[in-house]
From Swiss-Prot:
This protein's record includes keyword Hydrolase: no
Tissue expression remark: Predominantly in roots and endosperms and low levels in mature leaves.
Protein EC: 2.7.1.4
Function of the protein: May play an important role in maintaining the flux of carbon towards starch formation in endosperm. May also be involved in a sugar-sensing pathway.
Paired cysteines (S-S): none
CDD domains for this protein: bac_FRK (cd01167)
Entry keyword set: ATP-binding, Carbohydrate metabolism, Kinase, Nucleotide-binding, Transferase
Organism this protein belongs to: Oryza sativa subsp. indica
Protein name: Fructokinase-2
One cellular component term from this protein's GO annotations in UniProt: cytosol
Amino acid sequence: MAPLGDGAAAAAAAEPNLVVSFGEMLIDFVPDVAGVSLAESGGFVKAPGGAPANVACAISKLGGSSAFVGKFGDDEFGHMLVDILKKNGVNAEGCLFDEHARTALAFVTLKSNGEREFMFYRNPSADMLLTEAELNLDLIRRAKIFHYGSISLITEPCRSAHVAAMRAAKSAGILCSYDPNVRLPLWPSEDAARAGILSIWKEADFIKVSDDEVAFLTQGDANDEKNVLSLWFDGLKLLIVTDGEKGCRYFTKDFKGSVPGFSVNTVDTTGAGDAFVGSLLVNVAKDDSIFHNEEKLREALKFSNACGAICTTKKGAIPALPTVAVAQELISKAAN
């Protein structure tokens, strides 16, 4: 199970703004009609997904530099997903194939408002079997930002690989970005999910959570600032709470505020948070003074809100990720 050679190593080594994304990539099966159960769905659209991979693709589509570290089944779906990464401009040298496990699948139920529920087929799937010894630490240490979620924390050996990768990044002075991306059906219990997600909380420099995730993690009202600030810790540079179509809230040690969202025709919210994160990481990688400059941060968050909104207007995550031009067009229309 050697790393894939895709010829991107030299380019990544020379790229000062590389974002390395760690975790899972899978196939989402999205129903062709919203508002019905999985059993009632007449057909499904096959779409690549998995939050860390979506973030990597979002970064590349916006002109940034990204790489993905993770494991895939040595099956048609696995090879298809790695090809999709490459076609989207993502460095795939940190990807591995496992001949003994399948690529993960998820069936997505779309509610009439575009919100989702998930049913997963991944026990075990190849992404869960990545080991510490298989990590491409050279790639990780070349990054400016190391980004990850929490799904890779659920089971061994991937949990140990995740922690080792994160610590290698931190020891190299690389910024750590955390989007927990809570998926309760994958955890043994709600308590296990909460404990697992919070177990690495204070390793991050930047954390993005949704309002629903704030409510879950704090067991309180996400609109109550006291609950949000209970997630703050000394050393954190930026905490973002996304509030769906309402936009987002931001917190740093020096300032806080909110940035309104954009009104669009929402079809499927899959990948919206990943488009938001990817677009923000592109800007942080270019200029990390964003953490200390509120005007720059607000401009970046306006752009990220636009990217997240655009992603909800099509089914699937990666196919719906916007370009800079499309995001700027939405911002310009909203200003007029």
